[in-house]
């Protein structure tokens, strides 16, 4: 079965730099960054038995049944932001815990109902800002809203700078392949320079954010 971008396990491959750049330019256009107070975030359980699964109208416009079902099978949490409810992607889990300032190996063992309750009790203690990334129908990151801690660096802009630097230093460089999933972007170029002939993999990473 063909995967859809809303699914947590989605990935795609690229055979040319143009394909890689076009994909991330389109992704950047369709992504939303929302700044809000940590204390205003509200987490809701979205396990496989949750009544929310059968109530698509409860979610923000544009959220598909596939995104809701996939979330129920993975992280099992939704989040209300500025009055709108979104499924939460697995990639957002660590940054969500960071905003709540909690951690530990016991948390994943909790039921989604209890985990949501714990998160809400902790989140409401903090007045700091959060910077949320909404991408492919889900909340994909819950970063710190303090620009000292986190700044957005779009992958498409990074790729343009990288290609320009390669062209300036290594004439005739050739793009070999690219890969992207919801937590990582990687690409490799073949570089032939003077007496040097080798394959140099150049990798760009993103962890939810942009980079994610």
Whereabouts are the PLM-identified features?
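Intrinsically disordered, low-complexity regulatory segments
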Residues: 1-153
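Intrinsic disorder/low-complexity polar-acidic segments
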Residues: 152-212
């Amino acid at each position: 079965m063909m995967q859809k971008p809303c699914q947590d396990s989605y990935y795609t491959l690229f055979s040319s730099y143009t394909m890689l750049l076009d994909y991330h330019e389109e992704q950047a256009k369709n992504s939303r960054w929302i700044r809000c107070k940590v204390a205003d975030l509200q987490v809701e359980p979205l396990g496989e038995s949750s009544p929310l699964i059968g109530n698509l109208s409860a979610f923000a416009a544009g959220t598909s049944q596939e995104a809701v079902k996939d979330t129920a099978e993975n992280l099992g949490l939704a989040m209300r932001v500025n009055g709108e409810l979104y499924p939460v992607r697995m990639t957002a889990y660590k940054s969500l815990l960071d905003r709540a300032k909690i951690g530990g190996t016991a948390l994943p063992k909790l039921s989604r109902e209890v985990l949501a309750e714990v998160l809400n009790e902790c989140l409401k203690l903090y007045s700091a800002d959060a910077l949320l990334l909404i991408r492919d129908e889900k909340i994909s990151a819950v970063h710190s809203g303090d620009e000292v801690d986190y700044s957005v660096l779009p992958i498409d802009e990074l790729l343009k700078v990288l290609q320009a630097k390669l062209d300036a230093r290594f004439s005739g460089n050739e793009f070999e392949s690219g890969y992207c999933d919801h937590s990582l972007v990687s690409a490799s170029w073949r570089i032939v320079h003077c007496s040097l002939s080798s394959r140099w993999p150049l990798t760009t990473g993103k962890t939810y954010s942009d980079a994610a």
